[in-house]
Structure formats: structure tokens, C-alpha cells
Amino acid sequence: MKTFKYIISFILIIAIDLKANSYNSFGQTGLINLPSAEVHQEQSIYVTVTRGSFLKLGTITVTPFNWLEASYFYYRPDDLLWGGAKGLYLDKGFNVKLSYKPDSLLLPRIALGLDDFAGTGQFTREYIVTTYDFNNLKLTTGLGWGKFVGNSSISNPFALFSDRFKTRQDSGFGLGGEPNFKTIFHGRATPLIGMEIKVPLADDLTFKVENNPFDYFD
């Protein structure tokens, strides 16, 4: 199973423009679970709390600049045995996203992101995505590595430059605290695509759809 059975999210936002962008279940600017290339306005901070059928996740995300989004999260899986019981394990991780918007109106915003890059490996993944903003419609496409790769994947395009990108070292379930640069953007990749549609005459209502290859039970 690759999607939440149910998600209850509470979002507290401190920002200049509350309607600028929306957030995914991991507390990132994005779609449902996928990230987009967007970031929130400068000098903003927001908190998200997600309750799924098999984990609890709380994230604090800051946008100090219009090209940088960083988040710190805690999560508690419900199905992991720890201390002789389930639901007691508590872990943390870090996410970072670098975003760039070319001056041309014809070119999309592009972002490079590292999720859980210094954690224990439960959510370790990388992505490169672009987001086109067509007023009432935002289209996000890109590639994901690591935990993004599910049952369907493609060859790593970076393998054209070096064979070492073809395989990804299994980071396992580590202690965290140190980034493993030997795995970043390594191994097979998977396409990411999703869109967000704003309903006309209802500024606060949007529809989101995405492919979500991430395997939460891997």
C-alpha cells in the first residue's frame, strides 16, 4: 500500500500571504505527498501535524529566503516494534529544498530537494521537480530517487555521466545525524507528476491529484 488511508492535518502559518502556496502532508510546499518546486514567501514559518493510519508526523518549516525551504520533523510510526511495544518509537529528520525561478515567463520554477538527508533513512529521498503556474492550474513534474522509487522506475539519467549513479547503497536503518553523500541521487529514479487546480469563484478551494510512488511500508 502506497498511500495514506486517511490524513488529518492541522496547519499553523505565520506569513505575509497565506494564499500564496499550499502544503503537503510532510509539511513541504507541494501537493498531497509530493513536493512542488515552489517555496513560501520569505521570512515565513509554519507548522504541520499529520495523523495517518500508521504514523504521526509533525513538521516545522521555515523559508528564510525566496529560494530556500528547510524543515525539521518528528515522526512516530504506529507499526514499528520498539521497547517491546508498538507506537513508542520516535525519530526526527531534516529536509531542504533549493528553488529557482528563471526570469523568463515561459520557463517553470525548478527545485532540488533532499528529504531526511541526515536521518535514520526511513524517508531518505531526493528529487528534482519543475512547477508551471498557469494561474488557476499548477503542474509539477520531475524525478525522484531513494524512497520515492516504488514498483515502477526508470534508469538513472545521471548514469550517463558516471556508472556509479546506477546503483544505490542500502543505507539501512541507521542512527542518523550524518548525511550519506554516497547515496544522494544514486540508483534508479521514478517520474513524479501532479497538479493543483484552483476552483473558479472559490479562492480557498483547490483540487490536487498526483502519482505517489513512495512506499511507506518499505
Regions found by a protein language model. Give the residues of each.
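Structural motif marking the loop-to-transmembrane transition
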Residues: 3-4, 205
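Sec-dependent N-terminal signal peptides
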Residues: 4-15
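Transmembrane beta-barrel domains of Gram-negative outer membranes and organellar outer membranes
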Residues: 20-122, 134-135, 146-147, 179, ...
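Detector for outer-membrane/organellar transmembrane beta-barrel domains
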Residues: 125-217
